[in-house]
Amino acid sequence: MARPGRVLPKRQLGRCRFLAALAAIMILDPAAPFAAPERIVNVYNWSDYIAPKIIEDFTRETGIKVRYDTFDSNDTLEAKLLAGRSGYDVVVPTGYFLERQIKAGVFQKLDKRKLPNLANIWPTIAARLAKYDPGNDYAVNYMWGTTGIGFNSAKARQATGAAGGIDSWATVFNPKSLERFQHCGVEMLDASDDILPAALYYLGLDPNSANEADLQKSADLIKSIRPFVRKFHSSEYINALATGEICLAVGFSGDIKQAQKRAIEAKNGVDVGYAIPKEGAQLWFDNLAIPRDATNVDEAHAFINYLQKPEVAATNSNFVSYANGNLASQKFIDRAILEDKTIYPDEALMSRLYVINAHDPKIERLMNRLWIRIKTGR
């Protein structure tokens, strides 16, 4: 007679089934149980502000996937950072926002041992950034540029009757002048921290004035031109200029250069120009930083370090038409961009540019209230 089989207890039977299943998995894919967890970096950057190739190449080189979201306002970014648990590992604040965000404790110090490509940074730009981030402890410059006037060259000539194009803030802030552009479309950045200081500067006042009377004067000036502004938006003007939908925009230098490139690529006959007004304009710096509550800190450092490779920084500048803070990249940047004084200003032009300081909360609230009233026409 055959010996009867031993009946296993249920717990031991379950364990045997698990081991059998595990063995089957290992036969099909021996590495499966030991596969490394997926590496991810969550990035929050300005819209239209990176060459797509860079994200693809970074993942290919490092194995780190990039989840990439965009914003078009420092206020949007700041609201997420101050609320906490933003979900992002790398963010890109502008200098004067960076300064107060550092004071608010929303960033962690960079581990410079993980950023060997900082050897490529431009000391001049790093020194300017130190105004907002003493010691450059929390941020690395990503791009920098100016806030000026973009225009449709043909329609600007028709509106002004001048062959030389636009060279003054008077085109924007003189109501009689701006009215001439109303029929072909005017857009303006939706950014109190860009437009109010520009109006102050045009009035001969300190663009960093914290005087309430000065700020009211700048708001009153903008209210006087409000009827001629079709829209306040901080990114839509790029395509609108490129397609000829509008003829004038107050915007960021590289954005307007992108509009210029898109029009050329489309062969639509639209010639887009960019002017840094003769009175002067704002010089700003956008910077890479890691939120205090970032969950993928090593991956964040890897991403920042990758962006500071000279060839990568140059690829980015060639695509977005902004200057960067990487000195070693300049030998790889297209000559037309490097020699364009509206992108890389010379010393004479730099002397006419101003930078914005971080405002205290009281003044910031006042500026926001004035801006809302301007936009709503109240």
Predicted features and spans:
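Twin-arginine (Tat) signal peptide motif
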Residues: G5, P9-L19
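Early extracytoplasmic/lumenal segment of secretory-pathway proteins
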Residues: F34-Q101
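Hinge/lid segment of periplasmic solute-binding proteins
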Residues: E99-W144, A170-F173
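Ligand-binding "clamshell"
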Residues: I102-L110, A127-L129, P134-N136, F228, ...
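Short beta-strand->loop
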Residues: Q108-A119, A170, A266-Q282, P291-A294
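Ligand-binding pocket segment of bilobal, Venus flytrap-like solute-binding proteins
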Residues: E187-A199, L203-G273
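Conserved C-terminal helix/tail region of periplasmic/extracytoplasmic solute-binding proteins
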Residues: N239, E347-R378
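Mature extracytoplasmic/periplasmic domains
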Residues: D286, P291-R352
